[in-house]
Amino acid sequence: MRILLTFFFLLSSFLSVAQSRLTIVELNTENLFDTRHDTLKNDYEFLPDSPRHWTRTKYWQKLNRIGQTIIACGEDSSGWTLPDIVGLCEVENDSVLFDLTRRSLLRKARYEYVMTASNDARGIDVALLYSPFSFRLIKADTIRVIPMKEMRPTRDILHVEGEIESGDTLHVFLLHAPSRMGGEVYSRPFRMHVMERLCSAIDSLRSAYTDPKLLVMGDFNDYADSPSLQLAYEYGLINISAGVHGRNGAKGTYRYHGEWGSLDQILVSVNLRSWVTDCRINDALFLLEEDTKYGGVKPRRNYNGMRFNNGFSDHLPLVLRLQY
């Protein structure tokens, strides 16, 4: 009886520890498009008869590779578990998310999802996968980003409110800021515009809630010291991902002309800082390939120019672990 009681005590202690952890992933998927044309969207680049020859076979390979990437993000020194929350950028539509969560390698994970329906010209959006067993959805809403002068329609910001197992409410914001097309200086006001919209939403949230717990993540198309991120810091957000590396040579989430940089970021409010136990780039070896031009390694992307590379993404995922 004593042995049995000891076993149950240890088991309950293990479950208590396991339930008090949260794994969060951010990933730009690099053009996760299906093979069908969406009316009024410029998705012609990813159709079967396009120069990329984006076929059903390539599409399903891509879905399973994204699933493989997400699954790999659940591994750490204490074992493996599926991520609880996954923020995805560059996702085309609901059909893609249905296939990813119900028919790909992730089908047994039982993820639920929410996403934006933006006016982005290419039709790409952001989406949040979540495990209903560790994150109970309260509500999700879209923060509209109305283009300023000379700015093309871009992705809206996704705000998701959910309850975690401790009973705390977590507010998650997911964004994909405008690219640096036209140059960093020219495009900087567009990213500042998105950040100002985010900060305004955070202001409203803080007026409605007492000391809300905030997590902001996504592809900011800016670095940790960029003006748009500086604005976020002024609003009391802490960049947990600044300066993090991978274990296999990655010094950023993205590599351009041989230089590593992190366009992807994860920020938290001050009241979440003590919960953070780890933040890193997942540069598992299967996500990398040799950089034959500049040396070292680089993300094994799906396309090199127009050449199909049968890879994963041009971005590496960020992995954040919280313990509460």
Put a short name on every predicted segment.
Residues 93-95, 121-123, 180-182, 221-227, ...:
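Active-site environment of divalent metal-dependent phosphoester hydrolases
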Residues 1-21:
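Bacterial Sec-dependent N-terminal signal peptides
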Residues 31-33, 70-78, 87-90, 101-104, ...:
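Sec/Tat-exported extracytoplasmic proteins
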Residues 40-43, 173-187:
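Active-site His/acidic residue clusters
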Residues 29, 85, 91-177:
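Structured beta-strand-rich core segments of catalytic domains in phosphoester-bond hydrolases
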Residues 23-26, 84-89, 112-115, 127-130, ...:
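Structural recognition of the beta-strand scaffold that forms the well-ordered cores
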Residues 23, 200-214, 221-324:
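Metal-dependent phosphoester-hydrolase catalytic domains
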Residues 18-103, 114-126, 195-196, 290-303, ...:
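N-terminal, active-site-proximal structural segment of metallo-dependent hydrolase catalytic domains
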